[in-house]
Regions:
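Residue-level signal for well-ordered alpha-helical positions
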Residues: 86-87, 125, 182, 193
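Glycine- and acidic-residue-rich catalytic/RNA-contacting loop of pseudouridine synthases
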Residues: 31-45, 83, 101-165
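Short Gly/Pro-enriched turn/cap motifs at secondary-structure boundaries
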Residues: 62-63, 138-140, 211-214
Length: 278
């Protein structure tokens, strides 16, 4: 959690689950999802080596920014890719992210944590800003919708006059940097997200400075609309838990953030088996 970012160790990637040509992989923060002209050491290239598969066979159907960790969905066949596309068009491919964000300290904040939950939705369109960045509105904007819950909050140290929030986020669309842009637009920049105004460090009451070398955002699970529940989960990384425990003490709120229904897409409904959506 401290110091500059070091190279991601070359270790075996964790396979979280498989289903009919879909592969679910646990991406560590700091590792790019796909190769490009500048980066060849990526999740897909490492996985191709690990599985002894040609890189061309692996297609990321959900992509995580380099500084973000968690579940990445891969399609190993055209049929698998069409299956996920069908779920998306029906709004049935569910995803849950956990994030730690800050806001300005307000008059009602206290030094103790609170589990008061607020639920809502953000629906501002997102377009291009400078370089690779995105912004609300912007150039060539596209519709974007994020359901969210502010699950718990805690005051940061006296030397850092702001409030820490545990967020549960459910994107219904998949725009570039969508969650990061929406959080910042609503005064809740994610810790470590320097590109979008997030704090790059914080200071404890003892004066210790903690530098953040990743974004405090984790893709916790994806859920497939099968006749029986099929949820693929990635454990909450120690990075997020350690920060929360330092200021709020009790990390059980993370389990609530995983399970809380925060959008109509996550309410109980008759399941449709994947065979109906091919």
């Amino acid at each position: 959690m401290t110091g500059s970012r070091s190279p991601i160790p070359v270790a075996e990637l964790r396979i979280l689950g498989e289903y009919r040509g879909l592969l679910f992989v646990d991406k560590p923060a700091g590792l790019q999802t796909e190769p490009d002209a500048r980066t060849t050491d990526t999740l897909l290239s490492r996985l191709a080596t690990q599985l002894r598969e040609p890189l061309s066979r692996l297609h990321a159907l959900s992509r995580l920014d380099t500084g973000v960790s968690g579940v990445v969905t891969l399609g190993l066949s055209p049929d698998a890719r069409r299956m996920v596309q069908g779920w998306r068009e029906l709004g049935r491919f569910r995803r849950r992210y956990l994030g730690l964000a800050t806001s300005a300290l307000n008059a009602t904040s206290s030094t103790s944590s609170t589990s008061s939950t607020s639920i809502g939705a953000w629906s501002e369109s997102i377009g291009r800003a400078s370089g690779s960045l995105r912004t609300v509105g912007g150039r060539n904007p596209e519709s974007a919708h994020t359901d969210y819950a502010r699950v718990a909050s805690a005051a940061l140290a006296r030397a850092t006059p702001s409030t820490l929030h545990l967020l549960a986020l459910a994107p219904l669309t998949g725009r570039t940097h969508q969650l990061r842009v929406h959080c910042t637009a609503h005064g809740l920049p994610l810790l470590g997200d320097r590109a979008y105004g997030g704090a790059s460090r914080f200071i404890s009451d003892s004066g210790a400075v903690t530098a953040l070398d990743r974004i405090a955002l984790h893709a916790a699970w994806v859920e497939l609309p099968l006749s029986a529940p099929f949820r693929i989960e990635s454990p909450t990384p120690a990075f997020l838990l350690d920060i929360w425990r330092a200021f709020a003490g009790d990390a059980t709120a993370f389990e609530q953030a995983r399970r809380l229904a925060i959008s109509s897409a996550e309410l109980p409904s008759p399941s449709t088996d994947a065979t109906d959506l091919d």
